[in-house]
Amino acid sequence: MRIGVVGDPDVVVGFRLAGLTDVYEVKSPEQAAKAIEELNSNSEIGLIITTERIGEQVRDTISAVKKVVVEVPDKNGPIVRENDPVKVLVRNAVGVDIK
């Protein structure tokens, strides 16, 4: 299993330095969607990493992906959300609200 990365120049440089080769540097949501679709169609890729901001811009594309997609903060830090998606998943799964 290989890992694919889709991100802005500041994010992808770190993953390239870590030795990942399936790295796509994108500058627009259209480029990001195309890169994610390419990674999704590659049978050797098992995990796709992208930034939260790109994730929000191409949510429909990510929803159609059959692989694990992880969204990480970019250089500007994490996106502040009203509802933490992890808390929502836990509450739905076990019926307990995490504070």
Curated annotation (Swiss-Prot):
Pfam family, one: ATP-synt_F
Keywords, comma-separated and alphabetical: ATP synthesis, Cell membrane, Hydrogen ion transport, Ion transport, Membrane, Transport
Main location as per UniProt: membrane
Transmembrane intervals: none
GO-annotated molecular function: ATP binding; proton-transporting ATP synthase activity, rotational mechanism; proton-transporting ATPase activity, rotational mechanism
Subcellular location: Cell membrane
Gene3D superfamilies to which the protein is assigned, alphabetical: ATPase, V1 complex, subunit F
Leader sequence segment: none
Protein's membrane topology: Peripheral membrane protein
Entry GO terms, CC: plasma membrane
Keyword NAD annotated: no
GO terms for biological process, alphabetical: proton motive force-driven plasma membrane ATP synthesis
Similarity annotation: Belongs to the V-ATPase F subunit family.
Role noted for this protein: Component of the A-type ATP synthase that produces ATP from ADP in the presence of a proton gradient across the membrane.
Assembly information from the UniProt record: Has multiple subunits with at least A(3), B(3), C, D, E, F, H, I and proteolipid K(x).
Family matches, as NCBIfam families: PRK03957.1
Name of the protein this chain belongs to: A-type ATP synthase subunit F
Lineage of the species this protein comes from: Archaea, Methanobacteriati, Methanobacteriota, Methanomada group, Methanococci
